[in-house]
Amino acid sequence: ALDAVPTTGGMVVIPAGTWMFGSKDQMTSTTEVLSIKSKTVLHLCAGATLKLVEYGKAPNNKTLFIGCKNKNQSDIVIEGEGETSIIDGQGTRWWKARDNKETFNPGAMIRFEKGSRFLIRNLKVQNSPGVNITLSNSNGANNGTVHDVTIYNPSSETKTEQPSHNTDGISIWGHHMNIYNCNISTGDDNVVCDDNAQYIHVWNCDFGTGHGASIGSFTKNIKHVWFDNITMNGTTAGIRMKTGINSGGTLRGGGEEDWKFTNFTMTK
């Protein structure tokens, strides 16, 4: 259905029910499983669950599950009708692969590269094999908005269920991105700004388990980042700034024009 959307644009509606996507060939490739073209709305009705097919062995290559990879696509919307509109990555097998020291190299559940004007709203993303939402990956995507989205992956430290690994809630690598009114619990960073994250505003969000509001470890050309009115309950850190030997860069020094963190509340 997504392939049939004309170049002039259109909407693909997922009705209530459970709908599987993905094939073995797709899961072991480096292409999209669900590829979204410009001027397309992917709408999940209330009660609709879009579920990634589960396999007995984790894929050997990074796979992009939903979005557009290495393509200059713009004006894309992924939306639902609230928390009963669900995208479920069934990530348990991937997380177990990590624990068993098997190949563990999952891609992002939702990822937009290049292009501009991306909107994700009013739904729930859960159990991603890897990062839940990636906005660009140093390829120039810009002008993205995520709002009223619930993201849930088990904590990497949980003792009551399978821990998830490298499951950042929202990973930002582009510029002019707005994140607001989101509830995010993960096994890694709740929201993280990496290379080329500029003019980023994250506000009115609740962070559960995870590593908090993070900068890095890819820190090249990060500036004009503002986290405001963030409530945290169960995070391992409030603000987490990190880098690595092979992933560092220039992180300009914390002035009002560079990055700021305001109105944080930690309840646990």
Task: Specify the residue positions occupied by each region the protein language model found.
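Extracellular/periplasmic carbohydrate-active domains that bind, remodel
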Residues: 1-268
